[in-house]
Amino acid sequence: MTEKPEIWTIRKVLDWTRGYLAEKGVENARLETEWLLSAALGLDRVGLYVNFDKPLNPEELAACRGLVARRAKREPLQYILGTQEFCGLDFVVTPSVLIPRHDTEVIVEEALRRAPHAAAVLDIGVGSGCIAVALAKQLPHAQVVGVEQSPGAIALAQRNAERHGARVTLFEGSLFEPLGDQRFDLIVSNPPYIPTADLEALQPEVREYEPRAALDGGSDGLDFYRLIVPAAPEYLNPGGWLMVELGIGQAETVLGMFSRTGFCDCFTAQDPNGIDRVVGGRIG
């Protein structure tokens, strides 16, 4: 007699995948399993449980295996699914850009709180476009400009701007280089801020998959602040704000840069974990 082929129901695949990903060191293995299987099967997460006992056909199993194998190699879930939510908007993400973090929403919140009438906004290092697009959606009458060195990131930011109907003008280049004599009421930036020596200790998802150029901030993580902060006043209108995201333990040093450059009303803002995540100041 020939043995009957093993039947894999959604319940069985969920249980097996959850354990497998946990063994591979994936945090939140249960939740990520649900997202992966939802994507593979074209169901929402409720649909998985409604169809708990549904047997999967070979094509469905192959689709599940393909996504699970990628995650088991610690490829970020966001790259596998192709999107990440930020400020209530879904952004397309690829390995050409840093994955938007919820901590970065703090800089958007502070910008809207402190510069709600900004008519000209600049995002330095636009990446996926998440900050620029989020601000453009909340400041529909503002001229929002983004600068980015990576051609791949520029293309993706343009795609995300179009996806959300946001008016964002993008320039390829380094920092302030492409801007000529333009001036702004608000400049924001989430520059690379991880010290080079710390990169190897990052989680595999970050170390192996996200673009190193978007992470590496030089020997002490502060290289880009030394370039951005002193140059920013030349590109700010009177009363204009500069706000930057930063890493753990960097706020005091960056605040010093702001003060020495002549910024006033300097502040720090914390992320949901109580970590100083944004430093900002205003040109008088």
Curated annotation (Swiss-Prot):
GO molecular function terms attached to this record: nucleic acid binding; protein-(glutamine-N5) methyltransferase activity; protein-glutamine N-methyltransferase activity
Role this protein plays: Methylates the class 1 translation termination release factors RF1/PrfA and RF2/PrfB on the glutamine residue of the universally conserved GGQ motif.
Organism (species): Geobacter sulfurreducens (strain ATCC 51573 / DSM 12127 / PCA)
Family matches, as Gene3D superfamilies: DNA helicase RuvA subunit, C-terminal domain, Vaccinia Virus protein VP39
Binding positions (substrate): 190-193
InterPro entries per record: DNA_methylase_N6_adenine_CS, HemK-like, N5-glutamine_MTase, PrmC_N, RF_methyltr_PrmC, SAM-dependent_MTases_sf, Small_mtfrase_dom
GO biological process terms on file: methylation; translational termination
Family matches, as NCBIfam families: hemK_fam (TIGR00536), RF_mod_PrmC (TIGR03534)
Keywords: Methyltransferase, S-adenosyl-L-methionine, Transferase
Entry's EC annotation: 2.1.1.297
Enzymatic class: transferase
Amino-acid positions noted as binding S-adenosyl-L-methionine in the UniProt annotation, renumbered to this chain: 125-129, 148, 190
Keyword S-adenosyl-L-methionine attributed: yes
Similarity field: Belongs to the protein N5-glutamine methyltransferase family. PrmC subfamily.
Name of the protein this chain belongs to: Release factor glutamine methyltransferase
Pfam families cross-referenced by the UniProt entry: MTS, PrmC_N
Highest taxon above the source species: Bacteria
Keyword Isomerase: no
Catalytic function, reaction form: L-glutaminyl-[peptide chain release factor] + S-adenosyl-L-methionine = N(5)-methyl-L-glutaminyl-[peptide chain release factor] + S-adenosyl-L-homocysteine + H(+)
